Each structure stands twice: as structure tokens, then as C-alpha cells.
């Protein structure tokens, strides 16, 4: 589940397929943080 801001089929924000994997991993970690905050209702 990556950001939909991109032209990649998977929806990741990578410029090239090489960077797609890195961007996807970074996005997943970021999403996990948001999910944890959401469960704790912080903010």
C-alpha cells in the first residue's frame, strides 16, 4: 500500500523501477507510523 502520487502501476512514488522499491519501503514505514498514531489516537 504505497502513495498513489505517481504514474507507477503499483501506485508507488518512484521515478524508476529501481527507485520504486526504495520509495515503496519508505512509504510503508511511514504508513505504519501513521497507523500506530491512529490507534493511539495521538493528535
From Swiss-Prot:
Entry keywords, A to Z: Growth factor, Secreted
Main location (coarse class): secreted
GO cellular component: axon; dendrite; extracellular space; synaptic vesicle
Keyword Secreted carried by entry: yes
Domain of life: Eukaryota
Pfam families on file: NGF
Gene Ontology biological process terms in this record: cell surface receptor protein tyrosine kinase signaling pathway; modulation of chemical synaptic transmission; negative regulation of neuron apoptotic process; nerve development; nerve growth factor signaling pathway; neuron projection morphogenesis
GO terms assigned for molecular function: growth factor activity; nerve growth factor receptor binding
Subcellular location: Secreted
Family annotation (InterPro entries): Cystine-knot_cytokine (IPR029034), Nerve_growth_factor-like (IPR020408), Nerve_growth_factor-rel (IPR002072), Nerve_growth_factor_CS (IPR019846)
Function: Promotes the survival of neuronal populations that are all located either in the central nervous system or directly connected to it.
Similarity comment: Belongs to the NGF-beta family.
Name by which UniProt lists this protein: Neurotrophic factor BDNF
Organism of derivation: Macrovipera lebetinus
Gene name of the encoded protein: BDNF
Amino acid at each position: 500500500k504505497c502513495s498513489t502520487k505517481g504514474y507507477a502501476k503499483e501506485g508507488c512514488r518512484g521515478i524508476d523501477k529501481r527507485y520504486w522499491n526504495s520509495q515503496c519501503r519508505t512509504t510503508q514505514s511511514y504508513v505504519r507510523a501513521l497507523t500506530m498514531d491512529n490507534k493511539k489516537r495521538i493528535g
